[in-house]
């Protein structure tokens, strides 16, 4: 019987781009626009400039927003890091993960290096993006709870599959490439402790590693066929073992159902699960008017979000860096109430030291809601006690997701 890696390889190699439906291709173009805008907008950020100084003039590949040229690996690292750096990039509903940062960076770098056609780039995006989404569905929340960043560790597989699908690897070589990717995957979430920049690096590193895995396998380097389901495979290594796995998610309805079609696009520059609460807060700003009347705010949350976005509560109420603030739901609620928005400018050193914002974060607490549908649905509820009484505000789904999608003009507004 074929392993899951072999089954996926066989499907990917047989995929005919011309058979893809129009909506899927349109969404991928939407993704391209979003990611390219983010790469360019981050070009002068300190963390991007650190990488440019490290790798500049190492090759002949252009990176959007830079005059220097880079080699294949470093161009991918810079693009992927830039795309994800402000946490303004797409996410996947079903288990939060960022697909575009790695997959579009792969297209930008590998497209130049291998002189890929438009059809090849679309195929690589579909194949790699689909594998990332399906990996996220096998054991939702289990990777985060084990201390790993799904964007990073699944991104390596996605890029490997995307490149393998256009470099004419045989099914055997393709499965080996995925096996190799399992050993090149990395990315822990300890950045949460102090809001350091390693999370930003994850998609770039995944892109570089994934391309290497495919290129090595093309020259017949062997990797384990049982990389996903094996006793020492990806899920037994990177996912918390007390959470059930459904490996059939990797292959069920391949070619019929495309999960990559349902990527969500972010209206705010911060962690995915903070966003429904920001929408609630912005509406409450209009309803309450005088924010000083607020006595207490309680957020009803999904249990799986607490360890990343609510605890330790002292850090979340007083973020130690502007980057840490992006993963603090109390901070995000506070800026929604006070600023009425949550773009790039709201996550800077000035705002994280603003005493009015910090005073408000101290009034914000959470309660785990046993009926919360996370990770199947991303919602938010705020219960606010004011001098006049109680107000409840709900956001039933992620704005920008499949139930309430953004349109092209919404993406344009991000970059105006």
Where are these regions (language model features)?
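Secretory-pathway/luminal and periplasmic proteins that interact with or process carbohydrate-rich
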Residues: 59, 131-139, 184-191, 306-308
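Hydrophobic alpha-helical hairpins/lids featuring a short glycine-rich hinge
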Residues: 82-140
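Amphipathic alpha-helical interface segments
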Residues: 102-104, 147-166, 176-249
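Structural helix-adjacent loops and short alpha-helical linkers that scaffold large soluble proteins
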Residues: 113-125, 168-175, 223-226
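Alpha-helical support elements that line or immediately flank enzyme active sites
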Residues: 35-42, 99-120, 155-169, 271-289, ...
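Short acidic/histidine-centered micro-motifs embedded in hydrophobic/aromatic stretches
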Residues: 54, 124-131, 177-184, 300
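Terminal-appendage/accessory-domain detector
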Residues: 1-96, 198-208, 215-416
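Active-site nucleophile and cofactor-binding loops and adjacent substrate-binding regions
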Residues: 95-101, 122-125, 143-156, 201-205, ...
């Amino acid at each position: 019987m074929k392993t899951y890696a072999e089954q996926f390889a066989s499907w990917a190699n047989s995929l005919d781009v011309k058979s893809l439906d129009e909506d899927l291709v349109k969404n991928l173009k939407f993704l391209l626009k979003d990611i390219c805008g983010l790469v360019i907008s981050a070009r002068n950020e300190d963390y991007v400039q650190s990488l440019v100084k490290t790798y500049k003039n190492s090759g002949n590949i252009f990176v959007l927003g830079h005059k220097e040229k880079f080699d294949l690996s470093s161009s991918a690292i810079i693009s992927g890091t830039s795309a994800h750096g402000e946490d303004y990039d797409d996410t996947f509903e079903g288990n939060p993960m960022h697909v575009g940062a790695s997959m579009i960076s792969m297209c930008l770098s590998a497209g130049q290096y291998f002189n890929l056609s438009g059809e090849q780039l679309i195929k690589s995006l579909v194949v790699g993006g689909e594998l990332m989404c399906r990996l996220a569905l096998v054991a939702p929340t289990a990777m985060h709870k084990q201390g790993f960043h799904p964007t990073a560790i699944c991104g390596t597989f996605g890029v490997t599959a995307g490149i393998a699908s256009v470099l004419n690897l045989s099914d055997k070589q393709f499965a080996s490439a995925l096996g190799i990717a399992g050993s090149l995957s990395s990315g822990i979430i300890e950045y949460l402790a102090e809001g350091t920049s390693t999370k930003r690096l994850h998609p770039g590193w995944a892109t570089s590693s994934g391309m290497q895995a495919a290129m090595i396998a093309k020259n017949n380097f062997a990797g384990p066929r049982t990389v996903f389901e094996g006793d020492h495979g990806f899920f037994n290594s990177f996912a918390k073992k007390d959470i059930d796995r459904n490996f059939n998610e990797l292959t069920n309805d391949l070619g019929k159902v495309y999960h990559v079609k349902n990527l969500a696009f972010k209206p705010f520059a911060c962690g995915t699960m903070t966003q429904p609460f920001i929408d609630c807060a912005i509406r409450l700003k209009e309803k309450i008017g005088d924010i000083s009347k607020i006595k207490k705010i309680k957020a009803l949350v999904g249990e799986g979000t607490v360890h990343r976005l609510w605890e330790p509560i002292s850090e979340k109420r007083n973020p130690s860096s502007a980057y840490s603030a992006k993963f603090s739901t109390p901070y995000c609620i506070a800026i929604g109430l006070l600023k009425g928005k949550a773009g790039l400018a709201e996550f800077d050193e000035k705002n994280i030291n603003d005493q009015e914002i910090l005073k408000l974060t101290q009034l914000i607490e959470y309660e785990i809601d046993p009926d919360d549908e996370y990770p199947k649905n991303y919602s938010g509820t705020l219960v606010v006690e004011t001098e006049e009484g109680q107000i409840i505000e709900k956001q039933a789904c992620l704005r920008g997701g499949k139930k309430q999608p953004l349109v092209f003009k919404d993406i344009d507004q991000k970059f105006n």
